[in-house]
Regions:
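Vicinal oxygen chelate
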Residues: 25-28, 91-135
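Short acidic/glycine-enriched loop/turn segments that link adjacent beta-strands
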Residues: 50-51, 55-60, 85-87, 119-124
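Short hydrophobic/aromatic beta-strand element in the GNAT-like acyltransferase core
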Residues: 61, 76, 125-127
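Core segments of cupin and vicinal oxygen chelate
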Residues: 11-14, 21-72, 107
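Active-site beta-strand termini and strand-to-loop segments that position acidic
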Residues: 64-69, 128-131, 141
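Residue-level hotspots at or immediately adjacent to binding/recognition sites across diverse folds
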Residues: 19, 48, 55, 78-80, ...
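N-terminal beta-strand motif that seeds the catalytic metal site of vicinal oxygen chelate
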Residues: 1-31, 41, 88-91, 141-145
């Protein structure tokens, strides 16, 4: 019998990139591209339909895992069908409080593009543009930091 070792990753620090999203005109083509380039794994997330049911829309969403991921919950990002040509790669930064970080960011010149929203059973996020127009997201985990 082989002994197994469970690897525990340290909790990321505030401001760490913890998630990214890739909008794709052709999700199958783009998932194939990144699978071949980096070995990433793409798994359809059924939770996206549940989340978006409350928002009166539907969304096909694939969770992205590193090629060496040992659990389907060990994700690094997501892929979805692009809705508008303006949608671009979006990075999510971990924060202790979306509300506090939104206030600070707007004081520093950021523009709120999407107000704070809940991701059921996971946390909250908001999307902003920095003073130069670069889009990014804040993410607060329900599990805390």
């Amino acid at each position: 019998m082989e002994a197994t070792t469970q690897v525990t990753r340290p909790q990321p620090k505030e401001g760490t990139l913890v998630h990214f999203e890739i909008p794709a005109t052709d999700p199958a083509k783009i998932s194939s591209f990144y699978s071949q380039l980096f070995g990433w794994k793409f798994n359809k997330w059924e939770g996206a339909a549940t989340q978006n049911a409350t928002q009166k829309s539907s969304m096909d969403y694939w969770l992205i895992s590193h090629k060496d991921a040992t659990s389907p919950d060990d994700t690094i990002g997501g892929l979805y069908k692009r809705n508008t040509p303006q949608e671009q790669f979006l990075n999510y930064m971990l924060v202790k409080s979306v509300d506090d970080s939104l206030a600070k960011a707007t004081d520093l010149g950021a523009k709120v593009l999407m107000a704070k929203q809940e991701i059921p059973n996971m946390g909250w996020f908001a999307v902003l543009a920095d003073p130069d127009g670069n889009t990014f997201a804040l993410y607060q985990s329900k599990a805390g930091m």
